[in-house]
A protein has these predicted regions:
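RNase H-like, Mg2+-dependent phosphodiesterase core
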Residues: 1-231
């Protein structure tokens, strides 16, 4: 069962989660969600926000429904993103951390605690912060933030595909959302890269004929960021 709060107190707590960190294509998104401390506030039009869970475990339809619930019922919420060019400039971890701060800056309530999915956190002002491995499977606000980030990113990818139908034909972006599926990898080989591909990621560098970083040259498969199935 998901926990409502990290600590049983009255501090204003925000959950953070990202979407698209492992993608070869496009923006990285971060969602931020603050829920009321009152349990009764987790009901809206007969639907429980307790239905929220890790966005990867939800169907697209369910994510869209819960996205609307979070937008309506959260005490505060925000979505921020880093462009592919910023991911390349900073590296994906630093872009993620920068985007977290960007999302926090967009909130209007005075937050007192941050909980974030993962094992990295960059201190924000004088606010208490906690990085929690698998936090999106434990805390409601983190899972809700992941839903905002995932739906926002998927909608952005859909806009890109609508503007460039050949990107779906060539890379399967309408289905894989930028992750390194077999169809996407073959598209890089057959058609090269688009302006939205992340040039710091190994498969994209291979397609461009650019040298790989040392960890990729050693053949460490885990270093091939973005080579995973889309969810």
């Amino acid at each position: 069962m998901y926990k409502l709060r990290y600590k049983e107190d009255d501090a204003i707590e925000v959950g953070l989660d990202e979407a698209g960190r492992g993608c070869l294509f496009g923006r990285l998104y971060v969602g931020a969600v603050v829920f009321s401390n009152e349990y009764e506030d987790f009901f809206d039009h007969g639907a429980m926000l307790k239905d929220i869970k890790d966005s990867k475990l939800l169907s697209k339809r369910k994510r869209d429904i819960l996205y609307d619930y979070v937008q309506e019922c959260a005490l505060d919420k925000a979505v921020a993103y880093s462009e592919a060019s910023e991911v390349d400039e900073l590296n994906v971890l630093q872009a993620d951390l920068t985007c977290m701060h960007r999302a926090l800056d967009a909130l209007t309530v005075p937050i007192e605690r941050v909980i974030v999915d993962g094992d990295h956190w960059r201190p924000y002002k004088d606010v208490e912060g906690h990085a929690i491995v698998d936090g999106d499977a434990q805390y409601l606000a983190i899972a809700a933030a992941g839903i905002l980030a995932k739906v926002s990113r998927d909608r952005w990818v859909a806009e890109q595909v609508a503007a460039h139908p050949e990107w779906d034909t060539n890379y399967g972006l309408g289905t894989n959302m930028g992750y390194g599926t077999a169809v996407h990898m073959k598209g890089l080989t057959d058609h090269g890269v688009t302006a939205e591909h992340r040039r710091s990621f190994a498969p994209v560098r291979v397609a461009l004929g650019l040298p790989l970083k040392e960890k990729f040259q050693k053949g460490k498969k885990r270093g091939w960021i973005g080579v995973e199935d889309a969810t």
